[in-house]
Amino acid sequence: ILDLLDKLRKKYKMSLLLITHDLGIVKKIANRVCVMEKGKIVEQNDSSKLFSKPEHIYTKKLINSEPREKKLIKKKSDPILSVKNLNVFYKKTSRFFLKKKSNDCQAVKNLSFEISKGETLGIVGESGSGKSSVAQALIKLISSEGNFFFKNKNISNLSDKEFRSYRKNIQIIFQDPFASLSPRLTIQDIVSEGLEVHYKEKTKKEMKELTKKIINDVGLDSTMLSRYPHEFSGGQRQRIAIARALILNPELIILDEPTSALDMTVQSQIVDLLLSLQEEKQLTYIFISHDLKIIRALSDKIMVMKSGKVIEFEEKKKIFAKPKNE
């Protein structure tokens, strides 16, 4: 898309105003750059000069916002999740001479992988490669074919009622922190909602105390629990979404592009938080993203997807040192 925009700009001799928080895109396509902070332009310059010699402290902070990298696991345990021959199909309906014709579109094709406790599997690929379909299939938000085993138990064919007991062990954090939190509920209600389903034996007081603790664990103040989502920034909302997943004490968390809607400095903070929580609680992550910088910081192993297929699956160091696929 960026190449197309740049091609059209040159062809029609038009100007292009690009608004983004992705500095990699800015560096690639922009001639001049304006940096904004709190509604004001704090620095503007030619792209090459701004990236080589930034002047304002906020610009320097953005450019230097590199997340710390995860320490690789040396001793691996038995797989916590095994996926074998996963296939996902979507019904695609078209009209041909006023007659409806249904065709199956295969989003995921014979995908298999294993992940051990405490590991992070990074899944990367272009839009439409099947990344999010994998995530949704694993928590049974969409139907799929194949088998997946959680701690050696085949959970792929369980009914919704049977799978409910596993939901607290496998949680998901979605991409958009603005859409994934109900605007009608307080943060207390949002974070503690899962407790009322999976831990009905807990009293209201116990739930409130647990919610306070988990909110503190993600770097927020428990005095914020009576507020509503619109009162928080994007980064704070994603911390709330993380707290909602953590409160059920899961073993596996699937993160579907959780940093893509955040600016560079906040991305780095969220990555650092996820790494700290993983070390503290021995969490296993499946992290889906198209941002290789974030994937590199978080992952132990990386799976590259294209058109629903795995085209490369290797340890992080090998993928970045000697990628096999173009």
Map each language-model feature to its residues.
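Conserved ABC transporter NBD signature motif
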Residues: G146-N154
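ABC ATPase NBD coupling module
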Residues: K49-P54, F97-S102, I155-Q171, V197, ...
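A short, surface-exposed alpha-helical micro-motif characterized by mixed small hydrophobic
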Residues: V26-K28, I295-A297
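ABC ATPase "signature
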Residues: I41-N45, F313-E314
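Conserved ABC ATPase "signature" region
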Residues: K205-T223
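A short, proline-enriched helix->beta-strand linker immediately N-terminal to the Walker B motif
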Residues: I247-E251
